[in-house]
Amino acid sequence: MDSSSTTPLADYFWIAGIETIAYDDPLPSGSQVAASIAEDGEQQPEENGVNANGTGAPRHHARHSRQNSANRLSNSRFSIHTLDEIDGNTQSNRSSVTIRPAHAQGNGLPNEGVGPAPGIGLLDGFDFDDALVKFAAERENFLDDLTFSAGAKLQARPPMVNPRAERIKAEDSDQSGRRSPLRNLERSIKGSIRRKMSFRDMNSSRRQPVTPRASTPGAGAIPRQGSIRTTRRLSNYNSVIPPPEPLNTDPNMHPLKRRFEPVLLDRYPAKDVPEETARRGKFPDYVPMFAFPNDIQIVSSDDRPRSTWHGFTMTSDDNSKIYGITIIIWTALTSDVAEELEKRCEQWRQRHMSNEERELAASLGVRLAAERANLSSLLARLPSVPSGSSARDALDDQISTVEEKISLMTEMLRPLRHGAASKIDGLTAGESGLWSPRAYGILGRDVTRMAFWKDWLRAVLVPMTDGGVLRIPPSSPKVGRWQPLERYVVNLCTEAFSPLGSKTQVELGVRELKLYARQDAVNEIPGSRTIDIYALFRCLSLDNIVALFEYAMSESRIIFLSSHTGMLHLACHALVNLLYPLKWASIFIPVLPARLLSALEAPCPYIVGVERRYERIELPEDDYVLVDLDKDTIDATSQPVRLPRQHRRKLHALLQVAAPAKLRYGVATGPPPYAMESFPYDAFSAENPSLYNDYASPSTLAQWVAQNSSTFGEPSPASEVKPPIFNAFLHSKVDPNKPDRPGTSKSTRTSPPSSVSPVSINFPPMPTTPVSRSDSGFALTSTLREKRSRNFDEKTRRSSSFGVDKHGPLHRPSIPFLNGNGHAPSMSISAISVDSQPYTHSSYGGGYAPSTYAQSTLAASTIMPNMLIQPVFNTETTVWVEGHCFNWEEGALSSSCSVCDDRAEGDGIYKCSGCSAFAHGRCLGCVSLACHQSFYPDRVRAAFVRCLASLLYTYRKHLGRPSKDQKNNGRMYAFDMDGFIKSLPYDQQEYANMMRETQAFNEFIHERETKPGTTASIRFFDEVIMAKKARGRPGIVSGLSRLSTIRSSHGASSNSSAFSPPSRLKIPTYLSDTSDHMWRTASVPVPSAKFPGDYRSIVTRIPARLDTSLMREPRVIQGVPRPEQRGTRGLVRKQVPSMLGTSPTN
């Protein structure tokens, strides 16, 4: 990629989906089948140890632990193919079954659909109310009884865990940092590549010969270190990734269960433009397969399925990474296609279902539609009944009863839905109730752009939801009008340009929405402004986070498992980002398609993500780590190589105050809402607020890297904590008293007016028509319980170890690292510095810090590795939601809700004590973003980089002069690995020996051997090490001797130098240098011209291909104005401000 100003902001825009829906295979005449219901794309139970041919399976098959339909009902919220929405409008998603050939040795005879099913009688006298009562009381077994013609009950599959794997618990029993005793001598061979090749299935791979090291005496038992070239060859994507497996279509399969292979429908720029291909790179193969990792199925659903998103990573022919982001939008099938599909479904029902089953399913659908109509009439009566009256209470009880009945009946219908018609009158939205997914995506080569691409895609796809995203201001000439998708695509891929360093930022507009693309400064951790790490910390406990980090450091084969594809993307990128300054150099596939699951047998380290809904997941025989993001568990075949004891305890302690969301703020475990779907709670929220602010937030890495441990947990100033952006369109609404956009000649240092300001008088006008079909009263049915009651689910409470009793449940500044009694640091704890002042000087603090290998700065009683979590309780005036502590404020009538932007109702409103966000009682259930006081991403990154800086503290001392041969090979330095390891304390030498066998550490050393120390990426980490040295006591700068270790670990700084910067200490200023943190705004022309045709039909369509007639000639190309176009009219297009003449050095 060219790094000049002509680099596009995105390389390609593409569309993928189903080209045609055709069932060309003839229907079988009458084959015997064992039909079993598998709702919402979930796996069909198989007999334990029996494959399709009836023979014993020679391998351990990965199987899901869900045993029946009842268990499946509770584990499928927010997924693509399950539509149990928050609002209580339960929906069925797909009528699908798995058809497998019946065998004589099976456990039961199949039902050919000619007789009554076992366990169910005729519909005569069937009582639905009794069935509902039985279903509510015996839900675990009731759905099993409804498996009518499936024959005898099959055995449930065991959990998807290899028998050799064990649950990893981060206990403090092995704190020496040595190898776990579970690893015997034969399995303790180091070397990531050879260790991965030693599992039993690699018969075709020959082990490397074991030769002693010439420079290491007595090293005959240690295998020779693999060369970088050999490691790269084994880690090559194309060498270990097999070709995709073909689709296996069963002629007896239900039409809605059949999978279709996704295809590329269109792309921009098109493939017939060779000059663009040469500049942007070759469009990779298999993009549709990564967009639909589990292929495509037609979905039967009452409402439009929820839109989801995910990112993926591919490797090109030259071994470079290509990153993609995609959003899935569901489009209704046309009437003719739906009619043909319904005919085939009816033929299947006639062949494979009994009359009783079909009648029961149809009757249940009719009954459900009647109950939904009854609910609508009750809700219509609600505004006319006075609040607080007995009639209102009775009406509320009646509504609750009907809602519960609808919920139960919908769950009953889900496993039987294949027996009913796809469309139920009064219940199904759209023409047919059949939906097909379509993927819109972006490709590029900059991983830091993925968050920007995602939010840009969400913005341009809002009109396609046809009102499904709530609280979007209506289009108008003043606010802005939607443009065709084609013009937005040209604007991103051709007219927009990549920012040049940290001196510029690119502003891209979508209607009134302004998005800002920035590049990290050279003295910042790459990706620290754009890569999300909160989602990973929400899914896993701190113990599991540290264990996962240890597995990644030793280059294990890590497999992430989740029901949400977006969560896989977030977790993989977060883990790699936390390894800085090390770079993951092996296989990296955040979303592994189902047809590439055999890649799990790759004989090298990898980080891959696997969806839980895949039908067959075969785990490796040995040497893997399975991380379940939905259940917060880690299963592995061996314990991780633990960090040295003091480093591990110090890292864990810093994470407790940097990521207190679960410990102190009651955040539930699991993927966040924005990882589950594109528009959580039908709102356009912004999990990355910096993308919508023209003023870049100041970097705090220098502060937390150099901050003393005793002050690491101090809260951010109230002026720096802003409420989350729950509606980006309201956040970017046009102010009539402000220019249309900030100028490009200088930086704009003022943020746009907040739409949630309690003193703001600029409120958007109420639309003349509802924003969407379900927006009346902002989804009244979804928030009815919140309006009638203030009872919410209990969440965990912050730990009393952080002084809860002293400071109360508010987000107030609290002293970090307190013990159970909540006392402040004192001189009695010798390892805690007296200096607890906040970071106010330009230096890195003058408080006490240990020397290189001293004991931890935290006393053992304050580490709290197994801290107990106390629950937080909701009261009449306090509600905890996503880390927000909402307190009821009486009389705050001038405040506006941060979620819906309406004024306070009644006599008050809820206000978060941490970020000052406001919310109505009915809007508390729609709070999808965490409070900024509950999670500090900069401090989390600082904790990990401090840990690695401590491990590699003296590495530069062992970079010496290269030999003549090394110099001829391009090396500027020669690293003495043996000398580096011998200089470490004894308890760290074994961990360093492990690191020397990893590819990431070898790449780390190789980069420093071949590049000067002034290189930006190298100098940054060296300055982090210097900041660690600056935290030490004055006069003990190096701190490498054993005597200095003893002195620093037992002597507290009690002189005046502890309270002021030491005069003799040279303060590194590189980390705190903000001279290049300018981010001047350069605006890209916003598409705003008129276009022919019906406005609504054009902007709301879900196109399968881009319409070139709706495109316009680019006004600029990557910021460069086009040459003057002198046609017959002799008009010259007006040039817009661009980046001409601007360079990072200016």
From Swiss-Prot:
Biased composition regions of type Basic and acidic residues, renumbered to the chain:
164-177, 732-743, 784-797
Q: Which InterPro entries match?
A: C1-like_sf, cDENN_dom, dDENN_dom, DENN_C, DENN_Domain_GEFs, PE/DAG-bd, Tripartite_DENN, uDENN_dom
Q: Which GO terms describe its molecular function?
A: metal ion binding
* SUPFAM superfamilies referenced in this protein's UniProt entry, alphabetically: Cysteine-rich domain (SSF57889)
Q: Does the keyword Glycoprotein apply?
A: no
Question: Chief localization class?
Answer: secreted
GO CC terms on record?
cytoplasmic vesicle; extracellular region; host cell
- Give a single Pfam family match: uDENN
Q: In this protein, which residues make up the domain named cDENN? A: 522-656
- Record key words, sorted: Metal-binding, Secreted, Virulence, Zinc, Zinc-finger
The phenotype of cells or organisms lacking this gene is:
Enhances V.dahliae virulence in plants.
Gene3D superfamilies, alphabetized: 3.40.50.11500
Enumerate composition-biased segments (Low complexity).
Answer: 744-760
Composition-biased stretches (Polar residues): 769-783
Zinc fingers classed as Phorbol-ester/DAG-type: ranges: 883-931
Q: Which domain of life is it from?
A: Eukaryota
According to the entry, every stretch annotated as the dDENN domain falls at 658-1016
Q: Does the keyword Thylakoid apply?
A: no
List residues of the uDENN domain: 246-500
Q: Name one GO biological process term.
A: regulation of Rab protein signal transduction
Task: Describe the family membership recorded for this protein in Swiss-Prot or TrEMBL.
Answer: Belongs to the EPD1 elicitor family.
Q: How does it assemble?
A: Interacts with host cotton EIR5A (AC A0A5J5T2N2) and EIR5D (AC A0A5J5NT52) and host N.benthamiana EIR (AC P0DXJ0).
Q: What does this chain do? A: Acts as an elicitor that triggers defense responses in both Nicotiana benthamiana and cotton plants. Triggers the accumulation of reactive oxygen species (ROS) and the activation of cell death in cotton plants. Induces significantly enhanced resistance of Nicotiana benthamiana to both the broad-host-range filamentous pathogen Botrytis cinerea and the semibiotrophic pathogen Phytophthora capsici. Stimulates the expression of EIR5A (AC A0A5J5T2N2) and EIR5D (AC A0A5J5NT52) in cotton plants and recognition of EPD1 potentiates EIRs to enhance cotton PAMP-triggered immunity (PTI).
Protein name listed in UniProt: Elicitor of plant defense protein 1
The organism is Verticillium dahliae (strain VdLs.17 / ATCC MYA-4575 / FGSC 10137)
Q: What is the lineage of its organism?
A: Eukaryota, Fungi, Dikarya, Ascomycota, Pezizomycotina
